[in-house]
Amino acid sequence: MLDKIIRIATRQSPLALWQAHYVQHLLQANHPGLQVELVPMVTRGDIILDTPLAKVGGKGLFVKELELALLEGRADIAVHSMKDVPIAFPEGLGLVTICERDDPRDAFVSINYAHLDELPAGSIVGTSSLRRQCQLRERRPDLIIRDLRGNVGTRLAKLDKGEYHAIILAVAGLKRLGLETRIRYAMPAEESLPAVGQGAVGIECRLDDNFTRQLLAPLNHRETELRVCAERAMNTRLEGGCQVPIGSYAELDGDTLWLRALVGAPDGSEIIRGERRGPAENAEQMGVELADELLSRGAREILAEVYQDNPPL
């Protein structure tokens, strides 16, 4: 059966193509002789670039077209950045593999300033993420936070043209594109709690495709799977998408999982934080329990207001 060609559905951005080539390499390293080809496509999130992500709305903004290719048999697997993967999947599809996680932190990128704390009052900082925006505004209410869309290269070009004094990007994305020299510093989780699944690559396929699932099995990284499971369980309970002010980050120390999370008002006026420690085998339960705690402490009201202020187009 190794004469079968495995087709990877992927977005066309440089970062998405890097991730698809990465999975292609892993598959061929684990299964010598296997033919793997890429099927690049454009998603709705790639097309609508003149509107803030929160207002574009809709869960699965960057994955629906890829999932349609799976359902129609035009591709065998879809490779996603885990922070873009919705909490629910179309019938017949599922997330079957999570590859080893890269650095999940946010990156502070600036030409003239080495640290967020060095930015003068009134400096303009670019990010499209409500999660990043609320944490920035809490820490530095004197800054001007402006939306920033486009792929990594486009965002860096806007910084270089002087439209922003600093921008916030993902460390993993910059490293994968060979742009780590642009990182002034990686922001610790205490300063900017990462997004759910940030830094991890996930693989989706048809659940009845046992041949492909067997090929993918060696690519799954158990530690990453447990960490992301806790983060996604929390996000699922909060009914969050990838365009809401929710942060969640799990670390594993031996068999003990440490899960931190936050829900914040986009203006930074209120951020509700919580954490849990427990056996890694209870990762999903911990995520649900932490979400319930945040909801009981006011997260429900914050999220309701976010959805009201940013109705999907």
Curated annotation (Swiss-Prot):
Alphabetized Pfam families for the sequence: Porphobil_deam, Porphobil_deamC
S-(dipyrrolylmethanemethyl)cysteine: modified positions: C242
CDD domains for this protein: PBP2_EcHMBS_like
Cofactor: dipyrromethane
Primary enzyme class: transferase
Keyword annotations from UniProtKB, A to Z: Porphyrin biosynthesis, Transferase
Family: Belongs to the HMBS family.
Miscellaneous note of the record: The porphobilinogen subunits are added to the dipyrromethane group.
Protein name per UniProt: Porphobilinogen deaminase
Organism: Yersinia enterocolitica serotype O:8 / biotype 1B (strain NCTC 13174 / 8081)
